[in-house]
Design a protein with these regions (language model features):
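Short pre-catalytic strand/loop immediately N-terminal to key active-site residues, enriched for Gly-Thr
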Residues: 214-218
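Structured lumen-facing ectodomains of secretory-pathway proteins
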Residues: 1-199, 203, 211-213
Length: 218
């Protein structure tokens, strides 16, 4: 018969007498951030030819859309994006295409919010601009939208949202205050071969900010 075992635990953690600890993602983040309302939003940034977002430190206006940041999305709002930070959703086009389209319509930077839970690591190797481009989580995107003002057409249809953010040049902390922790994607899970529930307990092990042991002095 085929082996139908689905557990991902290995030896010796799957042994009955072993105490196995699962990993939960940390309920917060540490990094460069911007502030909207009373929340510090820590963003994810990958370095290619794009400048760091912190080079725009200070108060900045932003334009938030519910769309994917396609060329036609930015064209539809005319001059509204000029000199502001563009915020759009992940999906339908590559990350660098979203950022380039936004910059072509006057944006000084692009923030892309995830369309599902989790953090996005983006490839901007094909990006030809130097304007910053970063990503944030889906929940942080919803927070930014919630604290923005809708701009409508003459029929009351929302075209986009606008607001202000304070960009920091320093590291900071954002605490999520979630109702419960989420199991890390890399964590083992069971049952084990003997149908015992493994791991036995869970503790924070993902998204932990700590010293870099490869660098002298941390």
């Amino acid at each position: 018969a085929d082996d139908v075992s689905m557990h991902t635990g290995g030896s010796p953690g799957s042994y009955s007498q072993s105490l196995t600890v699962a990993s939960a993602d940390n309920d917060g983040a540490v990094g460069y951030y911007f502030t909207v309302g009373d929340r510090n939003v820590v963003y994810t940034e990958t370095s290619y030819q794009n400048e760091p977002l912190r080079t725009l430190a200070g108060e900045q206006e932003y334009v938030f859309i519910d769309g994917f940041g396609l060329e036609e999305d930015w064209a539809a709002i005319g001059e509204a994006l000029k000199g502001k930070i563009a915020i759009c959703s992940r999906g339908s086009s590559s990350f660098f295409e979203k950022a380039e389209a936004a910059v072509n319509h006057g944006a000084i930077a692009t923030i892309i919010y995830n369309n599902q839970a989790g953090v996005i690591q983006v490839d901007l190797s094909s990006y030809t601009k130097t304007n910053p481009c970063v990503t944030i989580t889906k929940s942080d995107g919803a927070w930014v939208k919630e604290h923005a003002i809708p701009v409508t057409d003459e029929n009351g249809k929302v075209l986009y949202y606008t607001g202000t953010m304070a960009l920091s040049s320093e590291f900071g902390t954002s605490l999520y205050h979630s109702e419960y922790y989420s199991v890390s994607s890399f964590s083992s899970w069971g049952t084990a071969g003997a149908l015992e529930l493994k791991p036995d307990i869970i503790a924070p092990g993902g998204s932990i900010y700590s010293v870099d042991g490869t660098i002298e002095g941390g």
